[in-house]
């Protein structure tokens, strides 16, 4: 494509420049305010003649200049005065670093575009009354082979080469890598090495009432193991692990030899660890607050602990940081008063304030270049250009249509209605290519707003974004050739378009992608967005006057609406006018900030004045749903997002784990790689190994599946891996090796068998042969299970491994437990899947865990079984095999064949066989009632469809649970064009038979079922906003069933938003009656399922 070579730079306010030239020269003293000269002593890399003393240069540096200009000034002085001038002729300024010392640490002055007077070192020297300050000029050395090898190891773990900058148009990736060094080092230096090594999994939430009932006199029994012996001791639920160890050693004072404890050792030499798991009970936390202890109490299991030596904190050693630190002032510009061109001599202007740019923003569309044309002939094409901020389109223009050829040239300027000074930080220039048949697009002028009629007939083909203000706060300028993303066709990938269209990354596949050439105005100086200086709001007092009662009620009604309720223009106007009143109610914040006109600089300044007075927000209790709302795709302002992150700081580790999936997705909505949210995730991952483990897999999975955000997730993951320590790096390496090896085996097995449900004996034989080869050659001897880092799997039990009868041919694998302190020989069962995106299953299982925590606050234990499931790559993942459980289909078939679907008594008889003792049978029925109620409510609220007897399971203790969540939010499956879901949830006659009832009869167990359902349903209604927000944040991730707000409307309807508590109760009881009336339809579907073998055996036991 031939492009123009030169465009004239824009000259800002020519009249101002002429006026400045006529000004009389002022004295040095008077000019310091506009062009401050700062004395700095530079220590040069060369030595004085005949000594080892380094040369120095004392310079007076212009405060308004940037670092690059300062470096050039040093170089010119060195060339003039150094005894080693040849050295400076040979090596230019870019071969050297500028370093300064602060509190014993070396910091690099990294950003060459940073204005000198904003440097952190100047502020530091001022506090110390040090003048002149000292900057060391140090030669840049090539990385050592050891450094390069470590980087290769990190890149392999990340699944992406973070050093590859061939597909970026600026240095944001490298810039962020450097900026994240400081928070990483601060967190590593501040963490407790012993606690980090043992990462106790605790909670500070009160013990639920139903668990309190299981503790007699506030005491629990603990079995402590050592070697081949054990000792049972009675302890208070309020005792800490340290107290328990002390009591144990007092009791065993004369029997140490029985427990294989050397006489010289005491309680300080040991810790308590869960038998068979890498899970420690340490710290000053009462034993009742350890999650493992609560799990044992909940399941009625004994608490078995092993007396163990603590792990060596040295194993978590972090490799010495090779990069100097960069401070948080790096990349920050000055205030408007420092950058403005007004009242300054021309010679004193080095960087110009964006707020001085009063002209409208414009872009020149030069042309597009496509490697392969669409097959359809006689098409025309046009470019639509939007200034976008989050989900808001601030203004829009488009070119005229032209015939669609391999190269289309426009060479036309599009001028927008927004002024340059009003561009907010994070604003995107969104470029989209539309095409359509020639008549549909005729007669349009170049800068016209698109007509809905013509655009409706055109098809969006390609898109790309450019951040208009870069990560350094500088306005983009000059020519760009941007490689565009192609819009996915129909299918699963289309679901991610909502998130993908916010990315500022260009398509790395340069050879095969559409490219667009644009030109932005050039300027004589860099244009910088100034920092906002907190100033009083002159309108503040006027708008804080007493509100009329009618308007107050109207405002309260707006604030009370749920997150899906759209705000009208009138609503927004009211919220903004009474912004100081809205500020008093934290619930108003998402709606208030949605009402801000982010494309007006004066309004943005007033918004920051508001944010400075957010005491009510800071002092309010944490509302996770509310806080997460400010992190969704509707908010791009870094200050708004930062107050949300600041609120999340009070989340305890267990809650961070609950919401980690959404928090990782929310990183996509950040305009820049470095953000408060990215730093929060980094910090919490480095503080707790369990969080770090899941952060690793959530990030790695996104890097593998989301090309649009690969770089962003990769830079965060690299920062984490550089601080997590040697032991974690070793664990991750083993896990990645295992997954890579099993993936190859799965692909080979799939290629051996056609895409059908049966599995031949030849395929099973091949699997066993391949697994034996792995075991004998290079499979790691042990590895942490990705969905449960407390478990370590050892050798494969090959005779128990098989290929499952399903289209995707998942592998059923069983491993020995690698921990010798495990109490049984039970294997660790894992289903390894290739070909399915497990992120939707992960989301549903995560929501089930959150529902459990909601019900816990109401003292409800609904016996949900959210089994382990994790996506480990692009359509790769692992699912936990739940022990001693089977599908309803198997139970029905094993008794009377396919007609078992119509036999009401089959399930009850099976449970009786598994629990022959009456007391155990009654306990199993009780568990069945609660778990059935829990899953009825959960599957109804989440709209989980495609429920058949092969994806509903039951354990031998009566715990019902659902698996395989491919259809959610009411996106139900049809069979022969008929909707298969004729009931709100699954409550079949055989389920009712277990509860002691049939037809319209009742029983004590059925009444209990109804009561529990209603309590569980009403409890979820109190958290409607949280559930809506959690799904909203996953809306843009690429899940085929979660692509629009209409999908999430399902939850709103299911929870009867707007109805009274009494009406909601009646509504759910009515749903139960619908299920009782139509239970036979489910049985008929199940019969068809058994006969036709639809998805038969796809996910047995997980």
From Swiss-Prot:
GO BP annotations listed: angiogenesis; cell migration; chemotaxis; endocytosis; immune system process; inflammatory response; phosphatidylinositol 3-kinase/protein kinase B signal transduction; phosphatidylinositol phosphate biosynthetic process
Chain positions found as Phosphothreonine: 1024
Domain PI3K-RBD span(s) in chain numbering: 217-309
Phosphoserine sites (modified residues): 1101
Subcellular localization: Cytoplasm; Cell membrane
Region named Activation loop: 962-988
EC annotation from Swiss-Prot or TrEMBL: 2.7.1.137, 2.7.1.153, 2.7.1.154, 2.7.11.1
Subunit composition and interactions: Heterodimer of a catalytic subunit PIK3CG and a PIK3R5 or PIK3R6 regulatory subunit. Interacts with GRK2 through the PIK helical domain. Interaction with GRK2 is required for targeting to agonist-occupied receptor. Interacts with PDE3B; regulates PDE3B activity and thereby cAMP levels in cells. Interacts with TPM2. Interacts with EPHA8; regulates integrin-mediated cell adhesion to substrate. Interacts with HRAS; the interaction is required for membrane recruitment and beta-gamma G protein dimer-dependent activation of the PI3K gamma complex PIK3CG:PIK3R6.
Task performed by this protein: Phosphoinositide-3-kinase (PI3K) that phosphorylates PtdIns(4,5)P2 (Phosphatidylinositol 4,5-bisphosphate) to generate phosphatidylinositol 3,4,5-trisphosphate (PIP3). PIP3 plays a key role by recruiting PH domain-containing proteins to the membrane, including AKT1 and PDPK1, activating signaling cascades involved in cell growth, survival, proliferation, motility and morphology. Links G-protein coupled receptor activation to PIP3 production. Involved in immune, inflammatory and allergic responses. Modulates leukocyte chemotaxis to inflammatory sites and in response to chemoattractant agents.
Name of this protein: Phosphatidylinositol 4,5-bisphosphate 3-kinase catalytic subunit gamma isoform
Organism of origin: Sus scrofa (Pig)
């Amino acid at each position: 494509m031939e492009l123009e070579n030169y465009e004239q730079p824009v000259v800002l306010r020519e009249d101002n420049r002429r006026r400045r030239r006529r000004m009389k020269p002022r004295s040095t003293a008077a000019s310091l305010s506009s062009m401050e000269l700062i004395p700095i002593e530079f220590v040069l890399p060369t030595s004085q003649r005949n000594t080892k003393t380094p040369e120095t240069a004392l310079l007076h540096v212009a405060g308004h200049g940037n670092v690059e200009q300062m470096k050039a000034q040093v170089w010119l002085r060195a060339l003039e005065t150094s005894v080693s001038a040849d050295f400076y002729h040979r090596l230019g300024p870019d071969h050297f670093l500028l370093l300064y010392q602060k509190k014993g640490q070396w910091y690099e002055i990294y950003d060459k575009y940073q204005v000198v007077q904003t440097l952190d070192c100047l502020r530091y020297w001022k506090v110390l009354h040090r003048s002149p300050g000292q900057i060391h000029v140090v030669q840049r050395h090539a990385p050592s082979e050891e450094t390069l090898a470590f980087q290769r190891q990190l890149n392999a773990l990340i699944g992406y080469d973070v050093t590859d900058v061939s597909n970026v148009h600026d240095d944001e990736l490298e810039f962020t890598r450097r900026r994240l060094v400081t928070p990483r080092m601060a967190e590593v230096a501040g963490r407790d090495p012993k606690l980090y090594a043992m990462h106790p999994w605790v909670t500070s939430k009160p013990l639920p009432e139903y668990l309190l009932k299981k503790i007699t006199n506030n005491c629990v029994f603990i079995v402590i193991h050592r070697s081949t012996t054990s000792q049972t001791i009675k302890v208070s639920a309020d005792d800490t692990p340290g107290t328990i160890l002390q009591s144990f050693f007092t009791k065993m004072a004369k029997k140490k030899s029985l427990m294989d404890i050397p006489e010289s050792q005491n309680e300080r030499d040991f810790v308590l660890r869960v038998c068979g798991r890498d899970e420690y009970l340490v710290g000053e936390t009462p034993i009742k607050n350890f999650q493992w202890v609560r799990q044992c109490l909940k399941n009625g299991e004994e608490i078995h602990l092993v007396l163990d030596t603590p792990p060596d904190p040295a194993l978590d050693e972090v490799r010495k940081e090779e990069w100097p630190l960069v401070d948080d002032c790096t990349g920050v510009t000055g205030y408007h008063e420092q950058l403005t061109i007004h009242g300054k001599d021309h010679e004193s202007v080095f960087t110009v304030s964006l707020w001085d740019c009063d002209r409208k923003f414009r872009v020149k569309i030069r042309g597009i270049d496509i490697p392969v044309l669409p097959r359809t002939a006689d098409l025309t094409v046009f470019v639509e250009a939007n200034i976008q901020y989050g989900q808001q389109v601030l203004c829009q223009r488009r070119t005229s249509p032209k015939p669609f050829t391999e190269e289309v040239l426009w060479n036309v300027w599009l001028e927008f209605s927004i002024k340059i000074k009003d561009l907010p930080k994070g604003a995107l220039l969104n470029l989209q290519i539309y095409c359509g048949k020639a008549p549909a697009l005729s007669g349009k002028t170049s800068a016209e707003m698109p007509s809905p009629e013509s655009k409706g007939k055109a098809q969006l083909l390609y898109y790309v974004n450019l951040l208009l203000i870069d990560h350094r706060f500088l306005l983009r300028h000059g020519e760009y050739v941007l490689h565009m993303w192609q819009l996915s066709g129909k299918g699963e990938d289309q679901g991610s378009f909502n998130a993908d269209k916010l990315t500022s990354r260009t398509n790395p596949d340069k050879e095969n992608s559409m490219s667009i050439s644009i030109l932005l105005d050039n300027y004589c100086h860099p244009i910088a967005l100034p920092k906002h200086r907190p100033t009083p709001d002159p309108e503040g007092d006027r708008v804080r006057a007493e509100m009329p009662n009618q308007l107050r009620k109207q405002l309260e009604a707006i604030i009370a609406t749920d997150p899906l309720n759209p705000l009208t223009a009138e609503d927004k106007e009211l919220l903004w006018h009474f912004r100081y009143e809205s500020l008093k109610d934290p619930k108003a914040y998402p709606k208030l900030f949605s009402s801000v006109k982010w494309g007006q600089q004066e309004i943005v300044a007033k918004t920051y004045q508001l944010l400075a007075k957010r005491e009510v927000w800071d002092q309010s209790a944490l509302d996770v749903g509310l806080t997460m709302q400010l992190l969704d795709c509707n908010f791009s302002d870094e200050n708004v997002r930062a107050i949300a992150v600041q609120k999340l700081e009070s989340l305890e580790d267990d809650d961070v784990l609950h919401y980690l999936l959404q928090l990782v997705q929310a990183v996509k909505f950040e305009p820049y790689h470095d953000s408060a949210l990215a730093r929060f995730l980094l910090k919490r991952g480095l503080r707790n190994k369990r969080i770090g483990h899941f952060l690793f897999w959530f990030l790695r999975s996104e890097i593998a599946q989301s090309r649009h955000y690969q770089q962003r997730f990769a830079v965060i993951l690299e920062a984490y891996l550089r601080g997590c320590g040697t032991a974690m790096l070793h664990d991750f390496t083993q896990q990645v090796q295992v997954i890579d090896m099993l993936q190859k085996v799965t692909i080979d097995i799939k290629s051996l068998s056609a895409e059908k449900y049966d599995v031949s004996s030849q395929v099973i034989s091949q699997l066993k042969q391949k697994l034996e080869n792995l075991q004998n050659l290079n499979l790691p001897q042990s590895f942490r299970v990705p969905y449960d880092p407390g478990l370590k799997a050892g050798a494969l039990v090959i005779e128990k491994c098989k290929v499952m009868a399903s289209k995707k041919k998942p592998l059923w694998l069983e491993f020995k437990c690698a921990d010798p302190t495990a109490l049984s020989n039970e294997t660790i069962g894992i289903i390894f899947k290739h070909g399915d995106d497990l992120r939707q299953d992960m989301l549903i299982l995560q929501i089930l865990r959150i529902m459990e925590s909601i019900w816990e606050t109401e003292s409800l234990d609904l016996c949900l079984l959210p089994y382990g499931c994790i996506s480990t790559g692009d359509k790769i993942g692992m699912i936990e095999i739940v022990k001693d459980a089977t599908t309803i289909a198997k139970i029905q078939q094993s008794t009377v064949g396919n007609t078992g679907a119509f036999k009401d008594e089959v399930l009850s008889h099976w449970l009786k066989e598994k629990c022959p003792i009456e007391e155990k049978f009654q306990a199993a029925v009780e568990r069945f009632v609660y778990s059935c109620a829990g899953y009825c409510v959960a599957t109804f609220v989440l709209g989980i469809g495609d429920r058949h007897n092969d994806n509903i399971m039951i354990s031998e203790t009566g715990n019902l649970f659902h698996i395989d969540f491919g259809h959610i939010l009411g996106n139900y499956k049809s069979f022969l064009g008929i909707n298969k879901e004729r009931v709100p949830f699954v409550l079949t006659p055989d389920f009712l038979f277990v509860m002691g009832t049939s037809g319209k009869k009742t029983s004590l167990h059925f009444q209990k079922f109804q009561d529990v359902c209603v309590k569980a349903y009403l409890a979820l209604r109190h958290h409607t906003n949280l559930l809506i927000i959690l799904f909203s944040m996953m809306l843009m991730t690429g899940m085929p069933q979660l692509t629009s707000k209409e999908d999430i409307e399902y939850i709103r309807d299911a929870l009867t938003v707007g109805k009274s508590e009494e009406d909601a109760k009646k509504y759910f009881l009515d749903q139960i009656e619908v299920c009782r009336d139509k239970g036979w339809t489910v049985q008929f579907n199940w019969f068809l399922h058994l006969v036709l073998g639809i998805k038969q055996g796809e996910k047995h036991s997980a």
